[in-house]
Amino acid sequence: MNDLISAAYSERLRRVCDHIERHLDEPLSIEALSRMAHSSPFHFHRQFTTWSGLPLYRYIQWLRLRRASWRLAFNPQDKVIDIALDAGFQNPESFTRAFKTAFGQSPRRFRQSPDWLAWHQRVPKLALQEQHVMDVKIVEFPPTRVAMLTHLGHPDKVNASAAKFIAWRRETGQSPIASSQTFGIAWHDPQTTPPAQFRFDICGSVRQPIAENDVGVVNSEIPGGRCAVVRHQGSLDSLPESVWYLFREWLPASGETPRDFPVFFQYLNFVHEVAEHELLTDIYLPLR
């Protein structure tokens, strides 16, 4: 298969994946999906499995279960039966069996105490999305007072710390999610840092200093200054690729020099509120 044919083939299958992610709440027939890929229904299953690493039905179910796991962890007001029905299951029993097979915990147990380390280990490794040229801008970031919770430990457990921070915001009304900014400060690269030494700060903007608390949330500030910023759209799993684009492609050609402060992210929306393909995250690289 020459490069042009291979690229067109992959692009068709990526369009199928994009369609699936945007229509998880709807019936997804093999006939309709194979037509999108310009393929026969008899061969499409094998083509999709070879390209993505997962059978089509497992890919669709995994996306629905993954979305359900976010709702279980971060939307305590959502009932398990409603989450099960929204994930395409006809009853809670079949949802429970599928969820436990996928993530090693029942939905109720996951809601009470999610094992994020096991969750990440069970996530299927799919074909990487093609990296496109990204629009990098240089902006003046203002000094921003924040409430901050530091996660120190395995990067796959950051979601547990995020859940604590979200609960603190909801319970105290300080740094309200709807009207405040949300940031993450990436002190270390998870690919090169021993898990026990990995640090990631979870932050929400505040107007006034916060009170002392037992959660570990403290007052801090993200310093102002020049930053390169690029917007990442889609799953946070592919966020490292956008970060590496800044360092590998943009920075060497820009003539700029990084400042002595780590890359940080601003989360413009959240995975328990929107579909993954709708996630928007601004990546900031501080510059001198």
Curated annotation (Swiss-Prot):
The keyword Hydrolase is annotated on this UniProt entry: no
Keywords of the record: DNA-binding, Transcription, Transcription regulation
DNA-binding feature ranges: 31-52, 80-103
Statement: the UniProt record of this protein carries the keyword Nucleotidyltransferase: no
HTH araC/xylS-type domain boundaries: 14-113
One of the Pfam families matching this protein, by short name: HTH_18
Outcome of mutating F265A: Reduces albicidin tolerance drastically
Entry's Gene Ontology molecular function annotations: DNA-binding transcription factor activity; peptide binding; sequence-specific DNA binding
Any one Gene Ontology BP term: cellular response to antibiotic
Putative effector binding domain as annotated region, ranges: 111-288
Comment field on protein domains: Binds the peptide antibiotic albicidin with sub-micromolar affinity.
Subunit note: Homodimer.
Function: Probable transcription factor.
Additional observations: Duplication of the STM3175 gene increases tolerance of albicidin.
Protein name: Probable HTH-type transcriptional regulator STM3175
Species whose genome carries this gene: Salmonella typhimurium (strain LT2 / SGSC1412 / ATCC 700720)
